[in-house]
Amino acid sequence: MLKEYRTVKEVVGPLMLVDQVESVSFDELVEIELHNGEKRRGRVLEINKDKALVQLFEGSAGINIKGAKVKFLGKPLELGVSEDMLGRVFDGLGNPKDGGPKIIPDEKRDISGIPINPVARNYPDEFIQTGVSAIDGLNTLVRGQKLPVFSGSGLPHAELAAQIARQAKVLNSDSKFAVVFAAIGTTFEEAQYFIDDFTKTGAIDRAVLFINLANDPAIERIATPRMALTAAEYLAFEKGMHVLVIMTDITNYCEALREVSAARKEVPGRRGYPGYLYTDLSTIYERAGRILGKEGSITQIPILTMPEDDKTHPIPDLTGYITEGQIILSRELYKKGIMPPIDVLPSLSRLKDKGIGKEKTREDHADTMNQLFAAYAQGKQAKELSVILGESALSDTDKLYAKFADAFEGEYVSQGFTTNRTIEETLNLGWKLLTILPKSELKRIRDEYLEKYLNKAEESK
């Protein structure tokens, strides 16, 4: 029989202090019954002697200290998981949001998860095709990797997220592919866009959606990514699926963390965020990966908006330390009408070399990637020079590089949000663009690949 406490001492923001408690443990799930019979949930955030600090998931509005009854349930916050979750939409706490019935779970899992033993990890080395050339060709995503997208306010990261979720697949694999999508603190319009896009394209059949709206309690945002990852771990490591987890927007998650930290009167760190922000983010990002002897995997694409487009802001800064690269969206390219506006030069996938090459993508992938990077960088330099000194100051070769840079942005990077390119199409397009330059300038590509692919590209022009 669970004890019922009527000793609520104080409620401040999303926190409740309960006095005279016994045998309560950290992270324990709490049920609060209000004077009108309404029930809410929370979790134990801190224990000090006979006092417990409870974090409320549904907010504290309407709670009367004298009439509230509190029960400590002796278990952490759990999610009931089953393969029937595929094709369903849930709120940030795992309750059905699509009008469908509740899931009959195969098992219930603690949403905090269990860290993967480093010795049991398998190295990520299998290519994931997203259908986006700027990612597949130049900043390749590898199965088991965590590759964030750094965006800015007003940039089309939602469209890019939906495109990747719709198009992503593992080549040459018999295993099922699933997408777990977590929208954190999103607007109603954006949430509806995701649901409609997934439903219209049929992608929802292989997807699980967790949607936390902007007007939902901020505390729910702290649980949402963990709910999504718990579902992903079950599908990956119990059902052998390749799972792609897309989370947007991590900035909203960090704001919720800051709100709780301020309510607890903790000493703030950089820009008011708690000093443990790095540790907390790592508990989310480090749940990606592959396990030796298991067929499935979890690949993460967390999306965050950089306040004032500042890469040195604590959220992108700390995310960059934990994850394996970043895809950066550019406001300058967006203004030019290039969609998706991926700035390939500062973007980076640290594991791209492991997922490309013969029998993975194609033998010439690494060489063409290096040549495209070098040529685009030189082309941008030539264009900047022409702005300062005038086009007449450029050599004939510089003019070709400037022409290449424009064609690269207009044809390779810009493909819209509905075009799904195979890796073969992406590599062939790269070769086609390289024909703009003289053969003598293609110094980063081996002669055998030049002979094999350059002639084909020139013939197809």
From Swiss-Prot:
Keyword Protein biosynthesis: no
Coiled coil: none
Gene3D superfamilies: 3.40.50.12240
CDD domains the UniProt entry points to: ATP-synt_V_A-type_beta_C, ATP-synt_V_A-type_beta_N, V_A-ATPase_B
Superkingdom of origin: Bacteria
Spans through the membrane: none
GO MF annotation list: ATP binding; proton-transporting ATP synthase activity, rotational mechanism
Keywords carried by this UniProt record: ATP synthesis, Hydrogen ion transport, Ion transport, Transport
Gene Ontology biological process terms in this record: proton motive force-driven plasma membrane ATP synthesis
PROSITE patterns, per the entry: ATPASE_ALPHA_BETA (PS00152)
Pfam families linked: ATP-synt_ab (PF00006), ATP-synt_ab_N (PF02874), ATP-synt_VA_C (PF22919)
Keyword Ion transport tagged: yes
HAMAP family for this protein: ATP_synth_B_arch
Family statement: Belongs to the ATPase alpha/beta chains family.
UniProt function note: Produces ATP from ADP in the presence of a proton gradient across the membrane. The V-type beta chain is a regulatory subunit.
Protein name per UniProt: V-type ATP synthase beta chain
